[in-house]
């Protein structure tokens, strides 16, 4: 098998960069046949120069590090309204008050309990790990 850009071999069959036979004349002493780009320029010099498409990602899709939330929310009347900067920041903060179906923040009425979900972590002075928090939320009691 003769590679593109190689000269001086006994065979006169030319093949392209993918190994397919190339029809043409020129043999070992002629110019390049069936080549293009940088490989065609290098073929006359006897150097093997692979051609490849210039892609920065090499076929891998990458995501940016930024995260964003929706810039609008349901206004409760069937339409949508733009969120303000304050609402966007509140939405990203952990442990905020949950919204009900109408999109309004729920504040506890008299007699309702608005706990933070930490059961006695302040009393012992130890912080819960991520796994402990997940286990606490799983149904079926304490694990």
Swiss-Prot record:
Residues 51-61, 86-101, 124-143 have a biased composition (Basic and acidic residues). It comes from the Eukaryota. One of its GO terms (biological process) is response to abscisic acid. Residues 1-143 are annotated as: Disordered. Residues 1-10 have a biased composition (Polar residues). Residues 24-34 have a biased composition (Gly residues). Keywords: Stress response. Induction: By abscisic acid (ABA) and water stress. Residues 35-46, 62-71, 109-123 have a biased composition (Low complexity). Coiled coil: none annotated. InterPro entries: Dehydrin, Dehydrin_CS. This is Dehydrin DHN2. It comes from Hordeum vulgare.
């Amino acid at each position: 098998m003769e590679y593109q850009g190689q000269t001086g071999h006994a065979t006169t069959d030319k093949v392209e960069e993918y190994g397919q036979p190339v029809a043409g004349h020129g043999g070992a002493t002629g110019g390049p046949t069936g080549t293009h780009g940088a490989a065609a320029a290098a073929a006359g010099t006897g150097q093997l120069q692979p051609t490849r498409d210039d892609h920065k990602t090499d076929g891998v899709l990458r995501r940016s590090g930024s995260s964003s939330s929706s810039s609008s929310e349901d206004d409760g009347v069937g339409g949508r309204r733009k969120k303000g900067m304050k609402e966007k920041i509140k939405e990203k903060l952990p442990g905020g008050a949950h919204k009900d179906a109408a999109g309004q923040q729920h504040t506890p009425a008299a007699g309702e309990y608005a706990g933070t979900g930490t059961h006695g972590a302040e009393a012992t002075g130890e912080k819960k790990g991520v796994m402990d928090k997940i286990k606490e939320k799983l149904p079926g009691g304490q694990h």
